[in-house]
Amino acid sequence: MNDVFLKALPVLQKLTTAGFEAYFVGGSVRDYLLNRTISDVDIATSAFPEEVKEIFQTSYDTGIAHGTVTVRENNEFYEVTTFRTEGTYEDFRRPSEVTFIRSLEEDLKRRDFTMNAIAMDEHFALHDPFSGQLAIQNKEIKAVGKASERFHEDALRMMRAVRFLSQLDFELDKETEKALESQIELLQHTSVERMTVEWIKMMKGKAAKRAIELLLKVKMETYLPGLKDEKPALSEFASWDWEKRTTEESIWLGLVVAVKPNNVNAFLKAWKLPNKTIQLVNKAYQDALKMKETWLTDELYHAGKAVFSLVNELNVIRGQENNQHKLSQAYEALPIHSKKDLAITGADLLKWSGESAGPWVKETLDKVECGVLSNEINNEKIQIKRWLGYHEE
């Protein structure tokens, strides 16, 4: 049995010893059945939150309104959630009310897909009322109950379906795909932040190309930031070899290269990306657009390692030769990597000249920077001083 389950097993045992039901549920059980890496486990129980807190010495109310208590066991923290049913969904994400119950099957009934509605008890026996194992065997993403109801409860589940297709290389069953297509407009009620997370996970999957093809088939791009009417660009984007991707930034650089938005900054901001990512992708955009492979010395210098590495990564994704080693060698061979590496400062110029500060200081440092980069002069203080025409004291 997987070590992650074995380590968490005492949590289940404490709950069952106290007279309650307790199970591993959700993604960890699915991934166990698929022989995928399991990072953490979710635990569901018939014990109500206050009952859970009585059983464990250390606990935290991390989501008690929805039945979740975090408990500590063997110096590890585990989320334990009470079986529950949910009322109507008023904002296509959150239920209007949550009712704690004692029935495992009723709890599993509210979950999104059958492969995520399998429970495992303390003896590692599986409880699978919705045939999730069969769906996994058939490599099928199938909604629990009516797909239209599951998507109406939380519209993000539509993106999750496409993401799982990419990650697992599965297919959507006919009813689920039909509901996805007919209810796709519900996605407009989903926050950008949540969609961005799903987009990144989708692009990291092994079947990203098929996922994008499905996304376009159901017109999901209409509700994604900056992608309305961009079907041709996304088709091109999907054709690249994304299994060669090594960074998240390459996903965003590839997207702007394919879409060519008028304002790259605004396009990326619409996805609520970190400023650091936006700045890097923005800086790399023009070089990536040109599919630059050969870099002059000053181009390498002004781009910096992060930019030329990102451009090279996208070039590889688009089928070009990997020049990373050659570019890195050329970059490391540069005499300086930023103006801060110069052997002189503005203070030196003021001291040598005896003049007041002014624009001339920056202009002179720029001149020295160019001279050092072109190997016209060595980056040594005395040589630079002579080169500028100042006499030695």
UniProtKB/Swiss-Prot annotation:
Q: What else is known?
A: A single active site specifically recognizes both ATP and CTP and is responsible for their addition.
| Protein's job | Catalyzes the addition and repair of the essential 3'-terminal CCA sequence in tRNAs without using a nucleic acid template. Adds these three nucleotides in the order of C, C, and A to the tRNA nucleotide-73, using CTP and ATP as substrates and producing inorganic pyrophosphate. tRNA 3'-terminal CCA addition is required both for tRNA processing and repair. Also involved in tRNA surveillance by mediating tandem CCA addition to generate a CCACCA at the 3' terminus of unstable tRNAs. While stable tRNAs receive only 3'-terminal CCA, unstable tRNAs are marked with CCACCA and rapidly degraded.
Positions of CTP binding:
27, 30, 111, 154, 157, 160, 163
Cofactor(s) recorded in Swiss-Prot or TrEMBL: Mg(2+)
User: Its catalytic activity?
Assistant: a tRNA precursor + 2 CTP + ATP = a tRNA with a 3' CCA end + 3 diphosphate; a tRNA with a 3' CCA end + 2 CTP + ATP = a tRNA with a 3' CCACCA end + 3 diphosphate
In terms of SUPFAM superfamilies, this protein maps to: Nucleotidyltransferase (SSF81301), Poly A polymerase C-terminal region-like (SSF81891)
Give the EC number(s) under which this enzyme is classified. 2.7.7.72
Q: Which domain of life is it from?
A: Bacteria
- Listed Gene3D superfamilies: 1.10.110.30, 1.10.246.80, 1.20.58.560, Beta Polymerase, domain 2 (3.30.460.10)
Q: Which Pfam families match?
A: PolyA_pol, PolyA_pol_RNAbd, tRNA_NucTran2_2
Q: Subunit arrangement?
A: Homodimer.
Identification of the protein by name: CCA-adding enzyme
Tell me the name of the encoding gene. cca
Please give the Gene Ontology molecular function terms for this protein: ATP binding; CCA tRNA nucleotidyltransferase activity; magnesium ion binding; tRNA binding
Q: Which residues of this UniProt protein bind Mg(2+)?
A: 40, 42
Listed A to Z, the keywords are: ATP-binding, Magnesium, Metal-binding, Nucleotide-binding, Nucleotidyltransferase, RNA repair, RNA-binding, Transferase, tRNA processing
